[in-house]
Amino acid sequence: MRGLRPALSTFIFLLLITGGVYPLLTTVLGQWWFPWQANGSLIREGDTVRGSALIGQNFTGNGYFHGRPSATAEMPYNPQASGGSNLAVSNPELDKLIAARVAALRAANPDASASIPVELVTASASGLDNNITPQAAAWQIPRIAKARNLSVEQLTQLIAKYSQQPLVKYIGQPVVNIVKLNLALDKLDE
């Protein structure tokens, strides 16, 4: 019984620190220093939330840039089901899945001449990736130009405008946020 009191008081102390003080402190500091990020990096148009800059969306029409495939297949880009497909490189199911994605991309992009960028046929680890490389976006230009009656030059400039360089030049690669790019594409039609 002598050891019960210190154990109980340590438990209560740690419960208050880890369950109360720490979450409250991180929430307050996050709201103070990074309010946009702490609230989900929501992209708004007026009072309407159009998406998040952190989570991809399922753009399926020919007039939109398509992102990486979502690993949450039943409900694409569902953050509650986030996670990879867990298929090993040696798994024949992964080969079938990639072959089906390649066939679908070839059918939707018959005018694209180069080989399909790998990120358009492989899901990210989270299954919610919102970024692709500018090269993967450029690969889709012929389909979008045809569907929206836009010039290749207009779409190339749009990709360049929304491309983000890595923080450190030699670590990482440039990326394009698909949600922001497609919202900008919609604004061209207005």
UniProtKB/Swiss-Prot annotation:
InterPro entries: KdpC. Keywords: ATP-binding, Cell inner membrane, Cell membrane, Ion transport, Membrane, Nucleotide-binding, Potassium, Potassium transport, Transmembrane, Transmembrane helix, Transport. The chain crosses the membrane at residues 10-30. Belongs to the KdpC family. NCBIfam families: kdpC (TIGR00681), PRK00315.1 (NF001454). The system is composed of three essential subunits: KdpA, KdpB and KdpC. Part of the high-affinity ATP-driven potassium transport (or Kdp) system, which catalyzes the hydrolysis of ATP coupled with the electrogenic transport of potassium into the cytoplasm. This subunit acts as a catalytic chaperone that increases the ATP-binding affinity of the ATP-hydrolyzing subunit KdpB by the formation of a transient KdpB/KdpC/ATP ternary complex. This is Potassium-transporting ATPase KdpC subunit. It comes from Escherichia coli (strain 55989 / EAEC).
